[in-house]
Amino acid sequence: MTTKASIIRRPAVAGQFYPGYPDELRSSVDEYLAGAVKSGPDPVALISPHAGYVFSGHVAAQAFKQAEGVDYDAIVVLGTNHTDPMARGCAIWPEGAFAMPMGDVPIDSQLARALMEADSRITFQRSAHQAEHSIEVQLPFLQRVQPGKKFVPIIVAEPTRENCEALARALASTLRERRALVVASSDLSHYPRYEDAVRVDHASLAAVVSLDPLALQASIEDSMGGGIHDLHTCMCGEGPVMTTML
């Protein structure tokens, strides 16, 4: 099937956050994955960073290694909004594909439509995706551990509790009968000194491990209100992570 050019999302950060040439990118991702270890049961959700690969590629590889070879029939990648101040609710890309150096990653349009029908907050917002990197940087790893698979990209544009709960309900209802993987794209603290970053990140991760969204919210509020110098955020993908926990 030929995909309409108008709904192909072009890469925004190829050659910046990750290698822009197919062979170089494939080699880089495979090298990161070769250094990762599969350490538990097949996951239903992952948290993966979205910084440049030179900074966080080894962490992303450890996350995606857990999904290598698992036969998922639905994949959703949740990103955060760095680039579009006008984006609202949850911004989905409902059909077509994301063009990438190693080839297009097709959209699961049937699942995307079901999610849009499940909640009116989930809408197609082209501008929210065009320059955003938080989903794009996950895709080379996804292409290597789940080759040929379709996916649904959603940016949690306004990460309010209400929006996260609505998206979580929509995901739960549409994925209930499927073997699904949800990838939450998030970095951790920006930009405190090392000692403070370790403390803040440990607190955030402990809350994530508890699987208690309220604990995560409280941890972030406590850290942000603690007067830590140069702490701009505890978790820039709070919306994707919160949604996944819910």
Question: Which role does the model predict for each range below?
Answer:
Residues 244-246:
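A conserved acidic, glycine/proline-rich C-terminal tail/linker
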